[in-house]
From Swiss-Prot:
Entry EC no(s): 2.5.1.73
Family under the similarity heading: Belongs to the SepCysS family.
UniProt protein name: O-phospho-L-seryl-tRNA:Cys-tRNA synthase 1
Subunit and partners: Homodimer. Probably interacts with SepRS.
NCBIfam families: PRK09331.1, SepCysS
UniProt keyword terms in alphabetical order: Protein biosynthesis, Pyridoxal phosphate, Transferase
Catalytic activity: O-phospho-L-seryl-tRNA(Cys) + hydrogen sulfide + H(+) = L-cysteinyl-tRNA(Cys) + phosphate
PANTHER family: CYSTEINE DESULFURASE, O-PHOSPHO-L-SERYL-TRNA:CYS-TRNA SYNTHASE
GO molecular function: Sep-tRNA:Cys-tRNA synthase activity
SUPFAM superfamilies in alphabetical order: PLP-dependent transferases
GO terms, biological process: translation
Residues recorded with modification N6-(pyridoxal phosphate)lysine: 209
Length: 371
């Protein structure tokens, strides 16, 4: 019942390529996987103050340095981090401006926080880019409708893997006196990212998507000036931070995040290799008639493809639109959702050159088989 069929497959699912556990994390999971075992020696009622295991050092020393921020916390996911920021800044009839490529959880978090939402439009096919100019125009127009208490940029987005010019967007937001939150769920842990270098106010990441941790867990960083607002304390339970509901990621999630952290800290230094690998993959897919959409040349391992050749095959092949999933599965390749043939996304993060070639050859074989 609990056997995972795809465990030993080549995994190209963007949700999972950056979240594969390290061997150190697997060992820590066995050691600390029982319930709240990390709370064995909690004396203050605060997760971030636990010193055995060294959670305090991780959250207050290592994580801020890694994120390039003043203050950091762990959350139960990037979406919970986004909501914490939005809810703490929300006012009656206020607005949040976010890019049209945003993850659905960004939009839902804003709705839950009671904020009005203005979307920065993306450019047309095939780039789907978010530009600083469109960001400025949307903020300008939205300010006429009410107070803009926050802006959010997705870096990169989870559809196309586009990396917008986040520094210019941060400058735009600063000029309009609007704090900026960077959703780096597919960036932090894969590539070098620094809140201070970007010039934004908040940054959130995903441990299970991009930091080799069990899910769900997120990270949140901010400038010192926002800590008093976002991390305000309960009136009755003086040690509890309200937006975090006291404590967040307890148990297997925090311990695997910490155990993988030394590896994650090192792997981001090899980001250029991951980009080159993705570009090589995209170029070879183009030779098969499968077009890579979004930034081109691409700057991230998450890629979105338009495959008319596969779509045409699906009209005639046995199994219809599920033929591609089944063909890849038979070759022990996992990650493209069942039923997708015309448009799909994938990630080459962490794959060896041999695995990349194997996946490319699989697509070539499939197309030749049905031609």
């Amino acid at each position: 019942m609990f056997k995972r069929e795809t465990k030993d497959f080549i995994n190209i699912d963007p949700l999972q390529t950056g979240g594969k556990l390290t061997e150190e994390a697997r060992q820590a999971l066995l050691e600390w996987g029982d319930g709240y075992s990390v709370c064995d020696f909690c004396t203050t009622g605060r997760l971030d103050e636990i010193k055995t295991p060294p959670i305090h050092d991780f959250i207050h020393n290592q994580l801020p340095k890694f994120l390039g921020c003043d203050v950091a916390r762990v959350t139960n996911g990037a979406r919970e981090a986004k909501f914490a920021v939005m809810h703490s800044l929300a006012k009656k009839d206020a607005w949040v401006v976010m890019d049209e490529n945003c993850h659905y959880s960004s939009y839902v978090a804003a709705e839950r926080a009671g904020l009005n939402i203005a979307l920065v439009p993306k450019t047309d096919y095939p780039d789907y880019a978010i530009t600083p100019e469109n960001f400025a125009q949307t903020i300008e127009e939205t300010k006429k409708r009410g107070e803009v208490v926050l802006a959010l940029i997705t870096y990169p987005d989870g559809n196309y893997g586009n990396l917008p010019d986040v520094k210019k967007i941060a400058k735009v937001c600063s000029e309009y006196d609007v704090p900026l939150l960077v959703n780096g769920a597919y960036a932090i842990g894969r590539m070098p990212v620094s809140l201070k270098e970007i010039g934004a106010d908040f940054i959130v990441g995903s441990g299970h998507k991009s930091m080799a941790a069990s899910g769900p867990i997120g990270v949140m960083g901010m400038k010192e000036e926002w800590a008093e607002i976002v991390l305000r304390r309960s009136e009755k339970y003086k040690n509890k931070e309200v937006e975090l509901l006291g404590c967040t990621a307890r148990g297997a999630t925090i311990i695997t995040l910490m155990a993988s952290f030394p590896h994650v800290r090192e792997r981001i230094k090899r980001w250029d290799e991951e980009v080159e690998k993705a570009r090589r993959f995209a170029a070879e897919m183009e030779k098969l008639g499968i077009k890579q959409l979004g930034d081109n040349p691409h700057n991230h391992d998450l890629m979105f493809f338009h495959a008319e050749v596969l779509y045409e095959i699906s009209k005639k092949a046995k199994g219809g639109r599920f033929f591609l999933y089944r063909e890849l599965k038979s070759r022990k390749i996992h990650g493209i959702k069942p039923g997708l043939t015309r448009y799909f996304k994938l990630s080459t993060y962490g794959l060896s050159d041999e695995e990349v070639d194997y996946v490319l050859n699989a697509f070539k074989e499939i197309i030749e088989k049905y031609s």
